[in-house]
Amino acid sequence: AWLEERLALYRATATAYTTRLCFIIQGWMANDEVNRLHDDLNSAFAGRVVLEQQMILDEDLDQVPVMLRNPGYFAPFEIFSRLLPLPKYSSYDPTPLIGLFFPLLFGMILGDIGYGMILLLLAFFLARHFPPGTLFSNIGKVLGISALYTLVFGVLYGEFFGDLGETWLNLHPVWFDRGKAVVPMIVFSLTVGVAHILLGMTLGALAELRRHQPRKALIKLAMLVAVILTVLALVGWFYPQSWLSTGPLLIAIGILMPILIAAEGLLAPLELLKTMGNIISYVRIMAIGFCSILLAVVANRLGGMTGDIMVGILVAGILHAFNLLLGVFAPTVHSLRLHYVEFFSKFLDLGGRRFEPWQKPHP
């Protein structure tokens, strides 16, 4: 402990510059703690130590250390953002975005009232039996929020352990039966994908403005417009509407693409194709959810075919437990994949340096 304390002291004093009459210490600290340090220095040294804040210059942006700090609702979702390298100071903390969209995608995929109730009970158990801030407590909180979305989408889909609600409780979908309405579910998934990706591209343009790179911001906004035009053209192609004419849209794309190619080279059309591929990836929301409802229906059918109510409950219970296990694992993995690969690639700049304040080592 003594050796660690001495090493910490030497690391801190290595940044100090001293003369016979004065000393200078330079370092980083959180902006909201500057006033407290100023008051502490005045109290301890009666104004003989001067604290000066310096503006962060553009050339120093990559050197600024990063500390993730999120309020109550978003804090548990740091278990996902910490799986990634830290974002750079000029980028964004991805935690709030994960906190907003991960439970939504999770609920869209699982979407079952019965499964949501079980997950809510499990989340309550984890949150109650583990100290706040620990891994399992945070998992419980994330699971609880995701379970609420699962309940909401379960009501919209009319699912209670698959089709058990329809058979026993006369439960019907508020929105649509995703086990039968495959095309509407595909359209819904792609719509969510378009909104998610466009948000990411908008954040990417704003990030370039924060770095004082207006040219790059304009290029990203132009690509955003190209994606919107392409999506509208595809909608008009597959679902012709009187108000949506594909001709002017294709002309606009034809005018915009040469401008992007002049600015970005041949990477511009490839980036457009890549972005469309990112959007298509959201079809997995429909595919995984469809598999989940089919497995739930199979569990109910096999349970009903046994001829014995106790054996049927046992068989159906085992199969539903297996489906629930898959129903937690698959939505988690694929929701995170949609964030890490499709969404964050549009704006998140990773590789930040962790903020490590000077302090005595903990015993």
Identify what each model region corresponds to:
Residues A1-L37:
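Coiled-coil termination/hinge junctions
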Residues Q26, N35-P363:
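Conserved, carboxylate-rich catalytic/transport cores that coordinate ions
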